[in-house]
Amino acid sequence: MAKKSLIQREKKRQKLEQKYHLIRQSLKKKIRSKVSPLSLSEKTKMREKLQSLPRNSAPTRLHRRCFLTGRPRANYRHFGLSGHVLREMVYECLLPGATRSSW
């Protein structure tokens, strides 16, 4: 089981990412726009605004975690579980439609 502080830190990052998502997205669109090209000085100002946002608001800082154990590795997106928990739940028939492989 992951430490509670790490799980809380990840939740805090998710909230920050949601809060600044639209701001970050609009700044990136303005920098990349080819319809109305910006001058070099305007682009640098936009980049400075982008860099002034909190680091933890960037989506690359997020990490998927198992919602039962908080484990950050070997997560299956479809289930939101780590491989260990997924395997145990399949063996106990707690996931409908998932079966053990046999050949």
UniProtKB/Swiss-Prot annotation:
Part of the 30S ribosomal subunit. The keyword Chloroplast applies. The keyword Ribonucleoprotein applies. One of its GO terms (cellular component) is chloroplast. PANTHER family: 30S RIBOSOMAL PROTEIN S14 (PTHR19836), SMALL RIBOSOMAL SUBUNIT PROTEIN US14M (PTHR19836:SF19). This is Small ribosomal subunit protein uS14c. One of its GO terms (biological process) is translation. SUPFAM superfamilies: Glucocorticoid receptor-like (DNA-binding domain). Binds 16S rRNA, required for the assembly of 30S particles. Keywords: Chloroplast, Plastid, Ribonucleoprotein, Ribosomal protein, RNA-binding, rRNA-binding. It comes from Triticum aestivum. GO terms for molecular function: rRNA binding; structural constituent of ribosome. Belongs to the universal ribosomal protein uS14 family. The gene is rps14. Residues 34-56 are annotated as: Disordered. It holds the Pfam family Ribosomal_S14. Its main location: plastid. It is found in: Plastid, Chloroplast.
